[in-house]
């Protein structure tokens, strides 16, 4: 499907969970001849990341309202109006055929600006429960898509765009069948780490002894303290790294993952075909719980909520999974994934631009 001469504006910012799926769709459409620009904010990660991908970015001034004081709430309508006006001026100059909202505060004024100019608005919700911005924009959007069922009652489920190196991993049967020795446990806390996993897993390692080998991604600034915790637990042999640059290689190594359940993490684990023990971040919307639930229902994962988390709960769960069980769970995870999510989102963008 040629997009020669077509123009897309991607609206996404704040966190990798919004930005990385947007980049995947942008690259897919650029390969078809589309021109792509980005709408973001100058003080969040998209400001540095997006230009590195060869995409020009325009900035508006906007931030979240949740948890702000009364003065900020009183000033909010004016701030939103100013952000809408900035976005509208940018879009009048660029003249996109369609805009794609991937979430983050920037999507709100950006989506309203596009709608006010008669530009089709396509939305993608990455999480199992819809964010406030997307809930508002869904009322004016041309097309609404969701990664997991339940965020919107009638939206099409298309999955989350996932990195191609993860999609290229061999299937679980090829990767895991015939593996012997200690079960390989990958612990992932995200770029900031997960303090609860950093505190719990060294003691889990002590309980499980030589039945497991652990690769623990501790997050920024935590490597030394986590290594020390493993050593104090009598388990200095396990590998601790601050970051994992090549997640596809880590997934290929692992037999099972212990991690938070951010939207992209859940989608990547399903695409890789891996069993998981999810410990959702305690958010008032229980967003990460809803992200993980489809894989638990599919028999591919177990959720332990943070309030229920203990060394025994994790150790007993991992000890109870034989290699045969892990392979079955891995195959169920892969079956529950949507490997062509990027193409599905890109196709809807193309369709909206032609409408």
Curated annotation (Swiss-Prot):
Give a short account of what the protein does.
Cell wall formation. Catalyzes the transfer of a GlcNAc subunit on undecaprenyl-pyrophosphoryl-MurNAc-pentapeptide (lipid intermediate I) to form undecaprenyl-pyrophosphoryl-MurNAc-(pentapeptide)GlcNAc (lipid intermediate II).
Q: Which reaction does it catalyse?
A: di-trans,octa-cis-undecaprenyl diphospho-N-acetyl-alpha-D-muramoyl-L-alanyl-D-glutamyl-meso-2,6-diaminopimeloyl-D-alanyl-D-alanine + UDP-N-acetyl-alpha-D-glucosamine = di-trans,octa-cis-undecaprenyl diphospho-[N-acetyl-alpha-D-glucosaminyl-(1->4)]-N-acetyl-alpha-D-muramoyl-L-alanyl-D-glutamyl-meso-2,6-diaminopimeloyl-D-alanyl-D-alanine + UDP + H(+)
- UniProt keyword terms in alphabetical order: Cell cycle, Cell division, Cell inner membrane, Cell membrane, Cell shape, Cell wall biogenesis/degradation, Glycosyltransferase, Membrane, Peptidoglycan synthesis, Transferase
Q: In which pathway does it act?
A: Cell wall biogenesis; peptidoglycan biosynthesis
The record lists the lineage as: Bacteria, Pseudomonadati, Pseudomonadota, Gammaproteobacteria, Enterobacterales
Please give an example of a GO cellular component term from this record.
Answer: plasma membrane
Any single biological process term in GO: peptidoglycan biosynthetic process
What the entry lists under HAMAP family is as follows:
MurG (MF_00033)
The similarity comment for this entry is: Belongs to the glycosyltransferase 28 family. MurG subfamily.
Q: Which residues are UDP-N-acetyl-alpha-D-glucosamine-binding?
A: 15-17, 127, 163, 191, 244, 263-268, 288
Listed Pfam families: Glyco_tran_28_C, Glyco_transf_28
Major location (coarse): membrane
Principal EC category: transferase
Instruction: State the Gene Ontology terms under molecular function.
Output: UDP-N-acetyl-D-glucosamine:N-acetylmuramoyl-L-alanyl-D-glutamyl-meso-2,6-diaminopimelyl-D-alanyl-D-alanine-diphosphoundecaprenol 4-beta-N-acetylglucosaminlytransferase activity; undecaprenyldiphospho-muramoylpentapeptide beta-N-acetylglucosaminyltransferase activity
Name the InterPro entries for this protein: GlcNAc_MurG, Glyco_trans_28_C, GlycoTrans_28_N
Please name the gene that encodes this protein. Answer: murG
This protein's source sits in the domain of life called Bacteria
Which species is this UniProt entry from? Answer: Escherichia coli O6:H1 (strain CFT073 / ATCC 700928 / UPEC)
PANTHER family associated with the record: GLYCOSYLTRANSFERASE (PTHR21015:SF22), UDP-N-ACETYLGLUCOSAMINE--N-ACETYLMURAMYL-(PENTAPEPTIDE) PYROPHOSPHORYL-UNDECAPRENOL N-ACETYLGLUCOSAMINE TRANSFERASE 1 (PTHR21015)
Known Gene3D superfamilies for this protein? Answer: Glycogen Phosphorylase B (3.40.50.2000)
Q: What is this protein called?
A: UDP-N-acetylglucosamine--N-acetylmuramyl-(pentapeptide) pyrophosphoryl-undecaprenol N-acetylglucosamine transferase
Its subcellular locations are: Cell inner membrane
Q: What is its EC number?
A: 2.4.1.227
The UniProt entry lists membrane topology as:
Peripheral membrane protein
